[in-house]
Each structure stands twice: as structure tokens, then as C-alpha cells.
Amino acid sequence: MMGENSSAYTTLADNQLYNQFSPSRRKADLIASTSATSSPNLRKSPNRGFSSPRAQQKPITIFDQIVSWFHSEIDVRKKLASFVCGAAVALSFIVTVSILKLSIWAPFSSVQDSLTWWLYPTSWPVTLFIWLSSVAWTFLIIHQFCTVTQVPRIPITDTYAWAGAALEFVHRLIFVYTAFTVSESSFFEDFAWIAIAFSVAISSALVIFRSDFHLNFSNVQVNSFKTLIDFAKSLPYGSLAETSGVDAAIAYTAAMALTVFGSPLLWGFSAWWLLINIQFHLVLFGVCFAQQFFAKIFMKIVNQIVMKPMKFPFPPPYTVHSPTPDQIRTLPNVIETDDPLLKMFALHDLRTVAWEDEKRRVDVFSLSQPGKHPRNWKAVSMPCTRMLDELCSRMTVSAARLVGYSWDDHDVENEEVPRDALMMPRKMREMTYRGAGQSRQQKTIAPIRSNNTQTVGFLAKITRNLGLGKTERLVISRFDAQQNAYAAEAVYMLVVDSMGEDRFGVVQKDLKDLITLLCKLIAAIDTYERAKASVADKSDVTYLRLVDASLKSCLQRVVTTFGSHLRSLELADEHIRTIKLVCAEEI
């Protein structure tokens, strides 16, 4: 595993351990400490604290160096995404002005003007201004909201989200104002501009609070002009247009309500003439629809540029005493970092190795020299199995809490969660434990939910959808679900590949433990699903089911590959039953 290079992997704890087992080093430190405390100049006084640069500075580990390098790379990608999105906004500005210049009263001259206006040098400064302002806007939005741990919808109580909505409103208002000025539109007059500005404000809030700013890997990676065309073809234009139309209709309805009810007070009854102005309706809805549609395309572009997969090499089989920065950024080191985005890149790369990269799988199944230890396999498999084991523990605790089992009074070493209590409906469970004595009831029944989600009223549902209500606590978030799915698909696909590629048997030694962990996790998720159904809980389990589907697919592949060879592992009866239920075949 990593850590065989003492010069590169030394931290503060390693120094202390080295001092403990090194007599010469301990003696030198003892002499230095004695002289420091006996010197009058360095003696600590009650009014002055003793400090030294060595004591104040936190040691920089290789993980800090890797994270620092990764953040610099991501910052470059975010800047590139900002420039590309700014160019897309400038292009949409040209299209918007061209459409606004069209007129049914002068069809030929207006068509010629709409197609050639942007070719004149006098129009270039305006387009450049739109591009630069859009670059600044997209850069701030990407840095503030686009994260790998972002929730599907930002809560409406988030103050930073409101600041982002205000920034979006100012940016879009400048866009519309400049487009109307260049096209010499007549909508600056009367109440039309107020209605359009109000619709832009509503649409800007919808862009921030109803858009998903989650960073995720794209299915099609753009590496050439052909892949760019494939990426453009892969975009779900139908669903994007549908969701954009719904959000644009909300902003359009709000602007029309202001025109009907607010215009007599603000402008007079003459503003009602806008209600029969077809061009006004088309422009109003078109402005909102264009804003919503670009917000959807915006995240596609950001994910394509920022979330471009990275390849991390494996360390060589021999020990490198003075590794270069490139030799430090190995996959075993990267996968151990605490940065969420970097870990997601590492797990995605490990999954790519397991599924597609046969050349790099040779490094996974290789042995270190000297010693012949499966260093790479242990380094990449242990973080994944540790992650899956933590998920198994969380699912067990969550299932116990759903049925009212107090985990605080549970002896982990001598007891197990009563399975009959997990499968029993709530009313029958309460009747059973009510007559079993006060002590048993206190030990077993300790519900954590005071309200039933079936009794949620209509108003509470509306506030929850708007983000005002109390959000339901998920057992597993989208980020955790994606991480666990990548970890499972990577490790267990490597197990499948080891059947024909593992020449040294580095995976076969851990095969029983890996299959046992997989069966335990599938059973824990099934137990939670049954407990959730027994208490009529309405919490969202979409992400949990994605993990469950990945786990069952992994188990199916492992059983299909090894078949009858699994009998020699002597698995427990409960794990054999899980395999029969999931794979529907005997082993």
C-alpha cells in the first residue's frame, strides 16, 4: 500500500513514532528540550506564551499537496467553462436581437437587417460587453452553487441563493435592455417594460431555486468535433423544452397578473391594451423561455468541461524514495483524500479501470517488489469496502430507528436487531410489546418520529415543495449514493476481472469477505425497505434504490462468473439465501 516511501509520506504522527523507536533521535530531542527549558531567554513566563514557528506550522502532507493541485486544475476548468458559457450568452444575444428586428410591416428590409447587423463593427462593443459580463456572472454562479454535494433544489431560505437570484436578475435585465436598445424595440414605452422586468425577476428566482446545480459526469465526453456533434445529439431537448416552458409559463403568468391587477394603479387603464397585443405576449414568453432554456444548457456545458474525467496512475512496484509531484498523485493516494470532488474523480477513474482499461488493471493485480505484496489492490479496495461497510451500518441503524428500536441500549457484541420486530406491522408490534413488561418496552420501543408523513396537509406539501418547510432527513444523499455505487461497481467488477487476469491470486484471498459484505449490505437495504413500509414512511428512497440496483447487479455478475466455485468459500446460510433471492440460482 501507500506509505512505503518514508521520505514522501512522513507526517507529524510518523515523526513522533520514529522518535519513540529511535534512541539517537530521542536523545537529541531530549538534549534540545533540556537546553531550551533551562535557558533564561527561552524560559516560559506566566505573562508570555511560548511559541515557535515549528509548533505553529501544520505539516503539509502529500494529501494536502494533491488537493492543492486538484483545486488549481478545477479552477482552470471553471474559468474555461465561464468563457464558453459567456460565448453562448453572446451568441444568444445575437439571435435575440435578430429576432426582435423582424417586422411584418417591412419583411424584406427587416430580414436583411436581422441577418447582417452583427457584421458591422459598431455592434461589436455591445456584443463584447455582453460576453464579458456573462463570463463574470457564470464564474460567480459556478463557484457558489455548482458543487458535487449540491441538493436537487436549493432551499428558498438560503440567503446566498437570494443573492444569486439578484445577480441573475441584474444580468438578465442588462441582457434584455441591451437587446431592446440595439433592436430599437418599442417595448421601452408604457407599461410593457415594467411587466417584462417583473417577469425577468420571477424567472431569475426560478432559475436559482428550481435548477439542479449538481456536478456530475457526462455520458458523452467531447474530445473532437465528432464527439461534439454526438454530445449535441445526446441532449434531451424535449424534456429541457418542457421544463423550461413550465417555468417560463409561471413567470409569464405572474407578469400578466401584474398587468391585469397592478397596471391600473401604477400606469392607468391604458396599460390593458397590452392584453390584446400579440407581439407583447410573444416577446414576454420568449424572454422567459430563453432564460430558462439557457439555464438548463448552462449546467450541461459546465459538467462537460469541469467534470471531464481524470486519469490517475498507479505507483510502480518498487519504492520511490524521492517521488516527483506526478508520482505522488497516484490513484491509491487520491482515493484516500477527504475532498469530496477529488474523491468522486478517483472513484470514477477506478470504475473506469475496472470496466474498460485492461492495461491499467495489470497494475491492480500486480505485486510490489521486494516483498511481493498486493499493495495496489489493498490500497484501492480497502477505501471502497470501508465506505460500503459504513453504509451497511447506517442502514441497520436507520431500520432499527424506524421500527422504534433504541440503538443506545443495544449491545453490539451480544445482540442483534430483532428481525421479528423489523418485519412486524406497527399496531401488532405495539400490542406485542405492550404486554411484555415495562422494562422490555422501554428497551425496545424508542421511536424517533413523532409525526406520520401520511397526515401532512396540503399547505405543508406546498411549503415543502417551495423549500419553506422542514426537509425530510434522507438516509443517504445523492452524493453518498453516487460514491457508494461507484465504489461497488469498481471493486466487484475487479473481482469479476480477476477470474481471468489475476495471475497472483491477490483478489481470491479477499473473495469471501467481499461477497459477505455485499450480501450483508443488500440484506440491510432490504430490511430498511421493509421497516419503512411497515411504518408507512413517505421519505424519498430514490438514491437508495440506485445503490441497491448497483449492488444487486454486482452480485449477479460475481455469481455468474464464479458459479459453483463459490461453494468452497463456505458462506453463511443467510448469505446463501441472499444470493438465491437476488440471482435466482443455486451455487
Swiss-Prot record:
User: Mind telling me which Pfam families this protein's record contains?
Assistant: Ndc1_Nup (PF09531)
Q: For this protein, what is any one GO molecular function term?
A: protein-macromolecule adaptor activity
GO biological process per UniProt:
mRNA transport; nuclear pore organization; protein transport
Q: What keywords is this UniProt entry annotated with?
A: Membrane, mRNA transport, Nuclear pore complex, Nucleus, Protein transport, Translocation, Transmembrane, Transmembrane helix, Transport
User: Which segments sit on the Perinuclear space face?
Assistant: 101-121, 183-187, 277-281
Q: Which InterPro entries does the entry mention?
A: Nucleoporin_prot_Ndc1/Nup
* Localization per record: Nucleus, Nuclear pore complex; Nucleus membrane
Highest taxon of the source?
Eukaryota
Which parts of the sequence are annotated with region: Disordered? 32-55
The residue ranges crossing the membrane are: 80-100, 122-142, 162-182, 188-208, 256-276, 282-302
Its placement in the membrane is given as:
Multi-pass membrane protein
The family line of this record is: Belongs to the NDC1 family.
Q: What does this protein do?
A: Component of the nuclear pore complex (NPC), which plays a key role in de novo assembly and insertion of NPC in the nuclear envelope.
What is the protein's given name? Nucleoporin ndc-1
Name the species this protein comes from: Caenorhabditis briggsae
